[in-house]
């Protein structure tokens, strides 16, 4: 696995975490 693919995978994982956090915050309101 080259570094570009690795960076993309990490980026997607971080974005998914952010979306999940936003959904949680939205539910807690």
Curated annotation (Swiss-Prot):
Keywords: Cell inner membrane, Cell membrane, Membrane, Toxin-antitoxin system, Transmembrane, Transmembrane helix. GO terms for cellular component: plasma membrane. Coiled coil: none annotated. It is a single-pass membrane protein. Its main location: membrane. It comes from the Bacteria. A short internal peptide (AARL, residues 20-24) is toxic against B.subtilis, S.aureus and the yeast Candida albicans but not against E.coli, green monkey (Vero) or hamster cells (BHK) cultured cells. It functions in various growth media and might be used as an antimicrobial peptide. The intact protein is not toxic under any tested conditions when added to growth medium. Induction: Expressed during exponential growth in rich medium and at lower levels in exponential and stationary phase in minimal medium (zorO mRNA cannot be distinguished from zorP mRNA by these assays as they are practically identical). Translation of this mRNA is repressed by secondary structures in its 5' UTR and partially by OrzO sRNA. Processing of the 5' UTR increases its translation in vitro and comparative toxicity in vivo. It is found in: Cell inner membrane. The chain crosses the membrane at residues 10-27. Toxic component of a type I toxin-antitoxin (TA) system. Expression in the absence of its cognate antitoxin (small sRNA orzO) leads to cell stasis and a decrease in colony-forming units. Repression of ZorO toxicity requires base pairing between zorO mRNA and sRNA OrzO, as well as RNase III (rnc), suggesting the mRNA is degraded. Base pairing occurs between 18 bases in the 5' UTR of zorO mRNA and the 5' end of OrzO sRNA. sRNA OrzP, which differs only in 4 of these 18 bases, does not repress ZorO toxicity. This is Small toxic protein ZorO. It comes from Escherichia coli O157:H7.
């Amino acid at each position: 696995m080259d570094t570009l693919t690795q960076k993309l995978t990490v980026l997607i994982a971080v974005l998914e975490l952010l979306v999940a956090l936003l959904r949680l915050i939205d539910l807690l309101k």
